[in-house]
């Protein structure tokens, strides 16, 4: 017996298009998550989207909002949603979000995912440093309700994959926490370099941000390696999953 599909109305479709991965969420009218899908950006095609986004046909989408750092991928998804489901999508940077966050940085050059992260954490009382472990490792500085800018460092996975690709004698290595600094073989040496190296990089960049701004900050981690690098020597982060999506949801709530 086939399971009966239930039509859901007044739904919100929210997506984050990254260099490596795309996340798309469906929220109901009460902003409760109904569905989440994830897939690699490199796989994007109309046939692939038909399979991954087929669930949309059973729902009435009231609003659709994306953050994207991959213009061609957003354009493909936007056109697909318009032609197949008659859904009009917006990209965050094309919207007015000045009531949620003020930008001191160059709006044209700041990724919309980073703006969404800032919107997600802003409470108009505290200052925040948001560290997002994605294709790049980004540090974003938010003071009260103002986004000041940040730091872009090489991403953990990107750096590891490049090292393995370019150095013939470096074996495939899965990163994990490691207690000893000195590795007794190549894999352990690579693990040590990435684990302790990135811990040092993160701690030092946070220290330098505090030194330059002379302000206290709450520290937020998000992204794939957030849990691996949470044990900093000098800073204790709060880990938040899907921070970008929740920032976009905040924009939807404000505009509905």
Give each language-model segment a name.
Residues 58-110, 143-156, 187-195, 199, ...:
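Short beta-strand-loop/turn "lid" adjacent to the catalytic site in phosphate-handling enzymes
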Residues 16, 67, 92, 130-136, ...:
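Short beta-strand segments
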Residues 8-33, 125-147, 163, 248:
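Gly/Thr-rich phosphate-binding beta-strand-loop-beta motif of the actin/hexokinase/Hsp70
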Residues 122, 168, 237-256:
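Glycine-rich phosphate-binding/hydrolytic loop that grips phosphoryl groups
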Residues 35-42, 178-215, 230, 236-237:
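Adenine-nucleotide phosphate-binding core of ATP-dependent small-molecule kinases
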Residues 113-117, 124:
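Alpha-helical phosphate/pyrophosphate-handling elements in metalloenzyme active cores
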Residues 45, 122-124, 148-192, 196, ...:
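Glycine-rich phosphate-binding loop plus the immediately following alpha-helix
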Residues 2-13, 17-97:
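N-terminal glycine/serine-rich phosphate-binding loop of ATP-dependent small-molecule kinases
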């Amino acid at each position: 017996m086939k399971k009966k599909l239930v039509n859901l109305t007044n739904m919100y479709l929210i997506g984050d298009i990254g260099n490596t991965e795309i996340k798309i969420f469906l929220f109901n009218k009460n902003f409760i998550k109904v569905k989440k899908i994830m897939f690699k950006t490199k796989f994007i095609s109309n046939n692939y989207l038909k399979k991954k986004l087929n669930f949309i046909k059973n729902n009435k989408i009231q609003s659709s909002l994306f953050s994207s750092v991959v213009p061609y991928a957003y354009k493909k998804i936007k056109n697909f949603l318009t032609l197949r489901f008659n859904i009009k999508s917006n990209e965050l940077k094309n919207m007015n979000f000045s009531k949620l966050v003020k930008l001191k940085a160059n709006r044209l050059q700041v990724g919309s995912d980073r703006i969404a992260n800032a919107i997600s954490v802003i409470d108009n009382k505290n200052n925040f440093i948001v560290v997002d472990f994605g294709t790049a490792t980004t540090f974003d500085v938010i003071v009260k309700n103002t986004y000041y800018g940040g730091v872009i460092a090489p991403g953990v996975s990107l750096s590891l994959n490049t090292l393995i690709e370019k150095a013939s004698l470096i074996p495939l290595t899965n990163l994990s926490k490691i207690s000893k600094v000195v590795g007794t073989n190549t894999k352990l040496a690579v693990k040590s370099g990435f684990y302790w190296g990135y811990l040092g990089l993160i701690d030092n960049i946070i220290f330098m941000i505090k030194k330059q701004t002379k302000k206290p900050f709450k520290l937020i981690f998000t992204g794939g390696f957030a849990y691996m690098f949470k044990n900093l020597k000098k800073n204790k982060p709060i880990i938040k999953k899907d921070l970008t999506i929740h920032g976009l949801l905040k924009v939807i709530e404000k505009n509905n």
